[in-house]
Amino acid sequence: MGGLVEDMLMLARLDEQRPIERGPVDLLSLAADAVQDARIVAPSRTIDLTVGAGVAFLVLGDEARLRQVISNLMTNALTHTPNGSPITVRVFAGQQQGKPPVPCAVLEVTDHGPGLTPEQASRVFERFYRADQARGRRTGGSGLGLAIVEALVTAHDGTVSVDTAPGQGATFRITLPLAPDALAVEPAAD
């Protein structure tokens, strides 16, 4: 119950358009942490991280809130992907629409769950919406996780979308503008 109240309070703060704290955040590092956390929670699951080359995935934002975005997407994928099916997290460079286009970091979380109908996909970011009401009751989902993702990504001047079809799983994609100096920084070699 406490988590639900916290989620509702966060959405209320975002509705009031309170500014978020912005500092340099390494999106790749957050993604790697989320994958590692998911592997600990679900050690029998295959969870892969793939990374595009060419830029440091440095964005300006609130690290704790961006960590929550990725955590919500990972929790959603773990909840809806059957055992034995992989989950893939990809981080790569892209461009947001605009004039001129804005260089951005793209993070995708792909699951192999039941997928969504077009009507469900159009509503999946609504507050309290659950595509599968029975599953929500079983897993205890509030229907706020993806609404929080959308609100937080929007507050970071980013976009969120879903590509899905029934029986085909889903890919949730967030794009966040790169920090001005991200293009000049080469990512660290592992």
PLM-predicted stretches and their roles:
Residues E21-Q36:
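A conserved beta-strand-to-alpha-helix junction within the catalytic ATP-binding
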Residues G84-V102:
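Short beta-strand/loop element within the Bergerat-fold HATPase_c
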Residues C104, L116-F128:
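Short conserved segment of the HATPase_c
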Residues E16-E21, L58-G61:
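Conserved micro-motifs of the catalytic ATP-binding
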